[in-house]
Amino acid sequence: MSEQQTADRLLGITRDGLMALGYSRELLRENYPFVDLTLPASPVERVPLAAFAQEPPSYRTACFGVALVADGAPDRLRRYASLGAPQLVTLHPRDNTIGRWMVRAETEPELLERLAPAEFQQRLIERQPEWNPQEILRAKTIKQPGPRQLDFFDVGLVPMLESAVQSKLDELLREVLADCKAAYHARHRRELNYAGLYRLIFRLIAAKLLGDREHPGPWTDSDADQVIEAVKSHYFARQRGEAVLEDANVRQLAWNRIRTGLHLQNLSVETLAYVYENTLVDPHTRSVQDIHATPRELAEYIVNSLPFELLPQDQRTVFEPFSGHAPFLIAAMSRLRGLLPGGVTAEQRHEYCVRMLAGMEIDAFALEVARYSLMLADYPNPNGWNISAGDVFASPELDARLKGAQIVLCNPPFGDFTKEERAVNPSIERPNKAAEILRRVLENPPEMLGFVLPRLFTQGASYQGLRERLAELYAETTLLVLPDVAFQYSQAEPVLVIAHGRAAATVHRRSAFVSKSDYPEFLRTGRPTWDDQGQAHLSDLRPQLWTPPLLSQLLEATQHLRRLDEVAEIHRGVEYQEPIAKFVSDEPKKGYVPGLKEVRDSLEPYLTLKPVYLRIEDKLMRSNAHELPWHLPKATANAARLTRGPWAITAAPDTSGLVCSQRFHGVWPIRDLPIELLAAILVGPVGNTVIGLQITSRDNQKRIVGAIPVPSLTSAETESIVALVREYQANRQRWMKNARTTNAMQQACHRLLLEIDAAVLAGYDLPPRLEREVLDRFAGEPRPGPVRFEGYYPPDFAPAIPLRRYLSAEYRNSAAHLTLERLKLVDDPAVSAMIEELS
């Protein structure tokens, strides 16, 4: 048998094996061309056979590449990385073997095994569950961590190719646009029709793509107008397409550059979306429309996080308001096609996706780009996509769209409405555009939703009602906070909001966070920096939607400790049926008892100030809080947060029997716990972190205060904290009585505050890095009370040294400047000369 015959036989064996894996004939392409993106010249290469997971073929859907190695040795296999297939099969006719290689993003492919034909066939049979089109496509698509990564797939391959293609295409189109503008202005004095120019560029790209994919038609003709007319006939036969730039010379110039430019056979439609965001949207339009286009990876992350497959096939209807260039619709189209059963024709797939997908967009050019992107993603089918032109907030069509959609995907504008917009549209209820569209979606809740929202959604008071509504409707939620580099042309810090599970019996609340340094890795792998999942039953108190990373780490580190509500009873103060001012006196009166009315006048750390007198009668009260044991020792704390910053709560011991108004909490020990320690727990950084990171309104809710962990302390350590608190109280009282001692007492009280905090922190025994993160929340934040406070550590102090150690005399004495002071200065000429000689 000749070498050529052996090669043909090996190719046939490989083709049959791939078909057995599930790659139908339309997913197998022979003599397939692709551009080598690893070389500056970007030459076109070919492989005898390539297998794809779905149409249209591209580096994003490529699963296997087959290469012929005629001389028996690998010959620059690196070029095949640009195909995008994670596995490369090499045919070696000289020794009648077949090689299997893992394609690397940055280096030469790695040989995994070299097999005889029969062994190769057996290997395909064994690995069918992992190597079928659906599994490989799933592995290549960014998603939440789930099943183990396929052992032959380099997760950096597709991002590397995306970056290379985007860079080359962006450079080409910027040059084309610049040349066209220059040529136009050389011939005309009137203003250039930019929409017509951009429309021309997109049509020529479509022609280039059709030609490079060898679709029947005059796509490679050198005459620009003939090609433009062919694109119009192919895609817009049933409707009138918008006009392109009227200058024939400029049209021809653009086509000459694009026709001979980067080969687009293996291009993915996501790259065209990238071109829209980076090349074809001018800064003015981006600003006016508040455009922060959804990156492809984020759209796919959201879409692949939603269980489309749980819906009946004919009910997977998707609606994308503010569709822009339709990133969610493109991602959803890919997902829908992958869920269709085998045997569905290309025409049936097209008709199905047209029925399932809908969008709405106010910007005419963005809408046109969206249709182009969908057309190209559904290559080579014509137009017909259901994207409406209109203002989402003013269109009467919105309600109908929302009622008809089972899945809503949205990246809305983050800005606020103008006064003019609100004046002409009385249906607007929220000042912010993102909050308003979420409100409207939740009025007609879909089975599933995926939103890109401002970070403020996680805990901002303006979103509290929407968070509560979302929690009521959906049992499965994910809030994934991203850094301010997620959008290319915006520094907004977004959160991905993903929700489904309308009738589940168990609640799952997932909170995740991606740091700026980890964001590139997240785009590659889908793995966040920090991930936390909570579970509860619907009968339980619903856990909050968002748990900040620091709070999660702090609660995990202290989960072995008792909570405050296990060692103390917490109750809100007395509330009157009429305004409290009617029942307050500054002087003692019959029927009145000493008490506290306003936090700002009556409470500072560890001290209650001059009390007022409250009238206490059953008939005046709204509740029975006046019957609580106010006469017993307790700690008093504010019931509403103190500041908008991290300091949320303060407290003071009380043995004088003060009755507190509803603006306070009373905290009574139910075990042998000193009230000074209760106050120190509430005043300290851990208590303020637990409360401050959970507050969604002005109130320090009783259940949140009760969740503060109680430090584990010996009797001696407890007595030490009590003594420090009493010393602080004594110094503060001396300070109030004698203003001349302000400086000395200020320093003494500052030192004592830090020592109390350090002693309480020691009882939590937090990892040093975590303790430092907790304390860093308060850096530069004024502390409630009379003591000037700028933080626990100097601004330039980086080590994670526990506060107690940092304040200790041993640590201070070991500081560098003190060490230098203890060393004697060596001023010996002989020693100096010797050191100079050694250096």
Residue ranges and their predicted role:
Residues 184-201, 263-270, 428-430, 587-589, ...:
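Structural motif
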Residues 536-584, 591-597, 601, 712-839:
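Non-catalytic DNA-recognition/assembly elements of restriction-modification systems
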Residues 2-207, 253-273, 473, 720-723, ...:
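Short, basic/polar, glycine-containing "phosphate-handling" surface segments that engage DNA
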Residues 146-355, 360-369, 391, 396, ...:
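Class I S-adenosyl-L-methionine
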Residues 68-82, 87-90, 450, 549-720, ...:
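Polybasic, glycine- and aromatic-enriched phosphate-binding surface used to engage nucleic acids
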Residues 156-197, 201-204, 213-215, 495-643, ...:
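C-terminal substrate-recognition regions of SAM-dependent nucleic acid methyltransferases
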Residues 106-110, 123-124, 330, 367, ...:
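Signature of N6-adenine DNA methyltransferases within the class I
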Residues 306-309, 319, 441, 503, ...:
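Proline-centric
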